[in-house]
Amino acid sequence: MTTLETLKWDGKKSGKVSLDLAVAKKTSSADLIHRAVLRQLANKRQGTASTLTRSEVRGGGRKPYKQKGTGRARQGSIRTPLRPGGGIIFGPKPRSYNLDMNRKERRLALRTALMSRVSDIKAVEDFGSTLKQPKTSDIINGLARLGIQKTEKVLVILDSPSDIIKKSINNIEKVKLIAADQLNVFDILNANKLVIGQSAIDKIQEVYAS
């Protein structure tokens, strides 16, 4: 179990909250997280790259020049892979890059990744509570009050973010908003800082406890 210090939106300390998630053993955690990240990135690939083989390229019915007497190497088709505009040997074809990983391992990898970032977590009691309308500058100033630099990549995790917060964060390049029940290993590891709403911590423990 880990105890996190909670902050208010104005940056002042407000109390403490516990985060208790089961993690993988040290001997296997690195491999588990690595496989989870590979799976996530592989599954994002569209797999639509496609090239034409010799049989698919248009043309090539006639012999480009006679067999003998030119002094050049013999050629039987203008669509041979040896010529510009010819077919591609062993080029990419549409395929699925999806990798499998069972649900139990995925959950364990996510919990392990999150608990490994405990020192970078900012638990906020009332994230964006003063926002009455979408305003990017208010979010930027609020993150600064939490001790986060403008150059840092930030992952904001909230239980049920309002449209006002979504629109306010949407225009900030290095800040990403994600719902507490839609966490993923890559975003957790890719961010420099994690800002988690107090209600989101409860949601995380409810959803990912097992």
UniProtKB/Swiss-Prot annotation:
GO molecular function, one term: rRNA binding
Keyword Cytoplasm attributed: no
Functional note: One of the primary rRNA binding proteins, this protein initially binds near the 5'-end of the 23S rRNA. It is important during the early stages of 50S assembly. It makes multiple contacts with different domains of the 23S rRNA in the assembled 50S subunit and ribosome. Forms part of the polypeptide exit tunnel.
InterPro entries: Ribosomal_uL4, Ribosomal_uL4-like, Ribosomal_uL4_dom_sf
Residue runs in coiled coils: none
Residue ranges, compositional bias (Polar residues): 44-54
Region (Disordered): 44-85
Entry GO terms, CC: ribonucleoprotein complex; ribosome
Any one of the GO BP annotations: translation
Bias-annotated ranges (Basic residues): 60-71
Pfam families on file: Ribosomal_L4 (PF00573)
Family recorded in the similarity comment: Belongs to the universal ribosomal protein uL4 family.
Subunit structure: Part of the 50S ribosomal subunit.
Descriptive protein name: Large ribosomal subunit protein uL4
Keywords: Ribonucleoprotein, Ribosomal protein, RNA-binding, rRNA-binding
